[in-house]
Amino acid sequence: MKTTRLVLLILGLGISPLVSSADEKAKPAADEEGFVSMFDGKTLKGWEEMPATDKKAWSVKDGIIVGEGGEGRGYLVYEKRDIADFEMKFSYRFPKAPANSGVNIRASKDKTGKRKFQAYHVDIGHVGIGKKVLGAWDFHTPGRKEHSCFRGDRLVIDKDDKPTVTKIEGAITAEEINKGGWNEVHVIVKGNRFKFSINGKPASEFTEHLPESKRLDKGMIQLQLHDPGMIVEYKNLRIKIDRPVGAVPLNF
């Protein structure tokens, strides 16, 4: 009987830490809580090509979304079409340079015909790694000023659409980009405030104080193919949607 009790005690001591360890592994990291995957790693389920073409520009290879540029600009659009406030994380790389891509947010059809879509654009293009491309916010906003918010800029747009730019301390530099390798991006969009980082360092950000009627309040998330012949790869795409539309949280 004593031997049996001793064996049970030893087994109990051995199992307890294993269960505890498993529980710990099951818990998401604090900075990943609330995020869900946007990509199943095998198919493009939940995504749609725009415009639709006979020659598919987007595919999945070895758990990676691969985009190959054809005639005109192409987009891969996430299934949820009216997203306003959210955080998005992903990794990207360009197997060959130069190449240009980015992510449109709050995108919708451009009724003026200037572009296919109006949107705020997270620019991650490696076209000489210039300040006007990589790490910038682009404004694809017909009918109003299309401001410059380059890598390292903090832009504030007042109610009259006048810009003020200051510099972000510790912003990512061209030398800190993995040319030809994977780079991690984190986009945060809340109300009228927008920012993103690359490899854990701030890239650029802006705040708009325009009337709501002049701002883009919600829309699609689109991965972009900018040029013919280019290749871009995406993986580990995940998103946390906070609200369809909402006010800016304090202390953001």
Named regions from a protein language model:
Residues 1-6:
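Positively charged n-region of N-terminal signal peptides that target proteins for export
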Residues 20-252:
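Carbohydrate-interacting regions of secretory-pathway proteins
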Residues 7-17:
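Bacterial N-terminal signal peptides
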